[in-house]
């Protein structure tokens, strides 16, 4: 399971000209599911995302996590994160989870974060989305479990 996380001052996702999710300070999480992913991996990754220290403390060091800064999550499914780009000029998605598996783990990821008290907005699974963000820093990390 892969999460490309970006520290944002604001982010939103639009489907069919309608804003369906938006946050201010927090993290934009692009979430990719791979074939071998499980609920256990999802919980480990969600915990890591929420606990990852990527916000600056009073000394300017990345020492604070999402909860410590009162931030929110915007979680957007992105199967292209599971692409194999090692050969040729066209990505292979053979390692990506099936749509049913990916939807289930995506929904469980969101529910897990919400159950931990984190304000969590979402995109729309499988939709053509326009994602806008102001990357604060920029600060971006690729987390994988």
Swiss-Prot record:
Substrates-to-products reaction catalysed: glycyl-tRNA(Ala) + H2O = tRNA(Ala) + glycine + H(+); a D-aminoacyl-tRNA + H2O = a tRNA + a D-alpha-amino acid + H(+)
SUPFAM superfamilies, sorted: DTD-like
Gene Ontology CC annotations of this record: cytoplasm
E.C. number: 3.1.1.96
Biological process according to GO: D-amino acid catabolic process
InterPro entries found in the cross-reference section: Daa-tRNA_deacyls_DTD, DTD-like_sf
Subcellular localization: Cytoplasm
Ranges spanned by the short sequence motif Gly-cisPro motif, important for rejection of L-amino acids, renumbered to the chain: 137-138
Pfam families the record matches: Tyr_Deacylase
Any GO MF annotation of the entry: Gly-tRNA(Ala) deacylase activity
Broad enzyme group: hydrolase
Keywords assigned by UniProt, alphabetized: Cytoplasm, Hydrolase, RNA-binding, tRNA-binding
PANTHER family, per the entry: D-AMINOACYL-TRNA DEACYLASE 1, D-TYROSYL-TRNA TYR DEACYLASE
Record-linked NCBIfam families: D-aminoacyl-tRNA deacylase (TIGR00256)
Subunit structure: Homodimer.
Primary role: An aminoacyl-tRNA editing enzyme that deacylates mischarged D-aminoacyl-tRNAs. Also deacylates mischarged glycyl-tRNA(Ala), protecting cells against glycine mischarging by AlaRS. Acts via tRNA-based rather than protein-based catalysis; rejects L-amino acids rather than detecting D-amino acids in the active site. By recycling D-aminoacyl-tRNA to D-amino acids and free tRNA molecules, this enzyme counteracts the toxicity associated with the formation of D-aminoacyl-tRNA entities in vivo and helps enforce protein L-homochirality.
Recorded domain comment: A Gly-cisPro motif from one monomer fits into the active site of the other monomer to allow specific chiral rejection of L-amino acids.
Family: Belongs to the DTD family.
HAMAP family for this protein: Deacylase_Dtd (MF_00518)
Protein's name according to its UniProt entry: D-aminoacyl-tRNA deacylase
Organism: Shewanella baltica (strain OS155 / ATCC BAA-1091)
